[in-house]
Amino acid sequence: MDLFLTGTILKPKGLKGEVKVLPVTDFPELFLSRKSYLAGKSDASVMPLNVLKASLSKGFAWLFFEGVDTLEKAEKLSGMHLFVEEKELARQPTGRAYLHELIGMKVLDGNRYEAGVISDILKMPAHEVYEVQANGRKILIPAVEEFVEEIDMAGRYMVVPRFDEFL
């Protein structure tokens, strides 16, 4: 089961079990409608948490979970990550994709010959960088329009006309 990080529980608020969550998603408004999460220090050891009440304020989500009704119980959740399954991810608008959907995608050069395969996506301060496995080497390509001409999700390929410049 693939799990995807949506937020991190920072600390409790008040005495009734409310927790402050840092959203790590482009869709923080989904915290208002999502009814459950899988919570844990990692995606390998998670437990289900059902949401009783949710609100958003100043860039944070504030959540009450079923069975978490004291400060002590809420403190035990501090530092845990909130995950959802892939089927629960928000649909992306046309022309957009989740980063994990790009892993394994073919990279074509300007002549439309296969040059490599995306093996990872690195998050850098300015933009993401595609790590491409090509002929046993790792090639890093900035994820910007200047270098990436086309991404075809249906065909599972990306066109990088200036690929040779990265060799």
From Swiss-Prot:
Subcellular localization, per the record?
Cytoplasm
Function text:
An accessory protein needed during the final step in the assembly of 30S ribosomal subunit, possibly for assembly of the head region. Essential for efficient processing of 16S rRNA. May be needed both before and after RbfA during the maturation of 16S rRNA. It has affinity for free ribosomal 30S subunits but not for 70S ribosomes.
Its taxonomic placement starts with: Bacteria, Pseudomonadati, Chlorobiota, Chlorobiia, Chlorobiales
Look up keyword Signal and say if it applies: no
Domain of life according to the entry = Bacteria
Fill in the domain comment: The PRC barrel domain binds ribosomal protein uS19.
Name the GO terms of the biological process aspect: ribosomal small subunit biogenesis; rRNA processing
Binding partners and assembly? Binds ribosomal protein uS19.
Q: Name one Pfam family in it.
A: RimM
Organism the protein comes from = Chlorobium phaeobacteroides (strain DSM 266 / SMG 266 / 2430)
- Please tell me whether the keyword rRNA processing is annotated for this protein: yes
UniProt xrefs under InterPro entries? PRC_barrel-like_sf, PRC_RimM, RimM, RimM_N, RimM_N_sf, Transl_B-barrel_sf
An example Gene Ontology CC term for this record: cytoplasm
| Similarity comment | Belongs to the RimM family.
Q: Which UniProt keywords apply?
A: Chaperone, Cytoplasm, Ribosome biogenesis, rRNA processing
Protein name stated in the entry? Ribosome maturation factor RimM
